[in-house]
Amino acid sequence: KDGYAELLADPEIEAVIIAVPLHLHAQVAIDAMLAGKHVLTEKLMAKTVAECKLMGRIAKEKNLYLATGHQRHYSVLYDNAVNLIKWGALGELHHIRAQWHRGNLPGRDSWQMPLPGGEIPIGGEEKDRFDKIANGIKSLERQVKAEKDPVAKQMLEGKLAQYIAWDSDKNGGQERALQHGFQDFELPAGHSRSALEELCRWRLWERTGGGLMAELGSHQMDAAGIFCSAL
């Protein structure tokens, strides 16, 4: 209930990982560094360039590590490509083409997460409510019951526990989202978006996310930067 203040006050903790919605990265990272903690943020580093610069200045002033978890920096494939460039094996670098084929289908990625308690389609009625989380719990319960392998069963039980905890946010989740600064909003088409939906689907909203270029395009820009820095 006290947020992360107690965590940052713990002298036994040396570093933190920032895994909150993008618009909160800067504030949490700055608070952590002011408390003397090293920081690893998920990408992007922050929502605005100004926030990134401020984070960098504080890290330098406090002599702390501040890193961003762009996955390409931890890939042996990209590390090998960097070495090939440094060795001159690829010749002179004139052009970089970066692409990543995810094959995402609408509604089947991590951007439009299911809402605790389910949701009614736009234009639908209560009888049309679809609860993907509750359905997932039922499916996992069946899988746990049928699984014979102890290791596989334990993994399924862990996933089931996550779904049950996720589902519990249907009770009080909206109020807690409002308390943490997320907002209700009326969309132009007449659809009412709750604070809980803004929290669960923060990548979809301009106030909380950075859009396609931030979430996906940044990987390709980062790849180009990695290779250019090898020159």
Model-predicted regions and their roles:
Residues 75-97, 110-114, 159, 166, ...:
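Oxidoreductase and adenylate-handling cofactor-binding alpha/beta cores
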Residues 77-142:
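Rossmann-like NAD(P)H-binding beta-loop-alpha module
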Residues 43-45, 69-72, 100:
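Short strand-turn motif at the edge of the Rossmann-like AdoMet-binding core
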Residues 68-70, 203-214:
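Active-site rim elements
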Residues 189-203:
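Active-site-adjacent bridging/hinge elements
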Residues 1-35, 50-65, 115-174:
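N-terminal glycine-/serine-/threonine-rich beta1-alpha1-beta2 phosphate-ribose binding loop
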Residues 35-48:
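ADP-ribose/adenylate-binding Rossmann-like module
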Residues 54-72, 81, 90-96:
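Rossmann-fold dehydrogenase core element
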